[in-house]
Amino acid sequence: MKTMNKLFLGLGFCAGLVSCSDFDEVNTNPTAAGEEYVKPQYALNNSIGQAQMNPGTAERVVVYNWASAARICGEMSFLNVGRYSDDYTSAYYYPDLSSSIKNATLAITAVENQLEAATTTAHEKEFFPNVKQFARIWRAYLISEFVDNFGPYPIESFLGENPVFNSEKDDYEFILKELKEAAAAINTSVLPVEAEGKCDPFDNVKYDPVKWQKYANSLRMRLAMRLSNIDKATAQTEFEDAAKGNKILTAD
């Protein structure tokens, strides 16, 4: 009898060891979407939407920080409530601008991780690298907004570790470098399918690679001009180099 009991205990122990391999599967929520299921263009869509479709904070920050201080806007010609309150500025810092940068970074890392894991379709294997460049361009713009409104920005932010804040000089060098590299890395022969194009909040762009390339070069020219009173040589070099590429010359 003791021998039989030991036999059953042994079999039960072995069965338990075998079933341990299923623990991770049991603890995985079948309805939760992990990063491997996140289309990078969705994250970029969210980033653009957060920054561009909430004028309640972004536009007011410009008015409060610049127009009101410079007396461009008369005291009675715009909404007076909260004019000298920092509530809107705080909301723009977090969650609006910070969340937008976080989602743009997510779009970049999602592309890198999914390409490495080889979970993409043949089309996505070509299209996703462009999405990464679009996200780099958009994030560069967002970082410029952060630096211009709040000062030093941590370049290594939203990567899972507590970042160190960089100087504004380093930030602008990073921004201009990102714009140059991203514009050059865009494959203008790879076009999005209809569903992917609809994911671009800019209705007249629709993840068109040429238009994003033009945006990158034009933005680089504009941001280079901001350095003209601080580092004229760099401003001129960056502007002239960006001007050699595709750029926005018409409203369409």
Predicted regions and their residues:
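Sparse, context-dependent recognition of short Cys/His-centered cofactor- or disulfide-binding micro-motifs
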Residues: 5, 32, 120
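Alpha-helical transmembrane segments and their juxtamembrane interfaces
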Residues: 15-16, 56, 232
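Structured, solvent-exposed acidic/aromatic patches
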Residues: 37-38, 73-252
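Bacterial Sec-dependent N-terminal signal peptides
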Residues: 1-28
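Membrane-proximal, proline-rich intrinsically disordered regions
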Residues: 20-77, 83, 87
